[in-house]
Amino acid sequence: ELFTGGARQFTVMGKDAKPDLAELATKIDVSGARGVHSVQPAVISISNLTELGARLSCADISAYSDLAKSRGMKLFMDGARFANAVAAGSDSPADLTWRSGVDAISFGATKNGAMAAEALIFFNPGESKLS
């Protein structure tokens, strides 16, 4: 929290490490309930595949995106296992990201043997600039 101006991360559990939408909505609403007196939620972060190896479908991703957009938030995807998610189904990379409402995705090549190589892709180019 010190380096982010008070931002914090919270975890929402669900089957196969897919965050439960109802619990996620409740946590978002409760965490922002103090208005200007607390940091407001800004991003939902998901991973595909999940930490337990479950694949998020386009419908799953769209549901997280719809929740994010309904609260004025963005949807971020950790792409660490994204190639596995693409290989495990018939959806294209575009279907599993921007067509389903993902605003940004990151790829870290360190897990694949690269040294300090990271990429962050914004699907809306106007959001890629720091304010």
Q: Model-derived features: where do they sit?
A:
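Conserved PLP-enzyme active-site core in the AAT-like
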Residues: 1-131
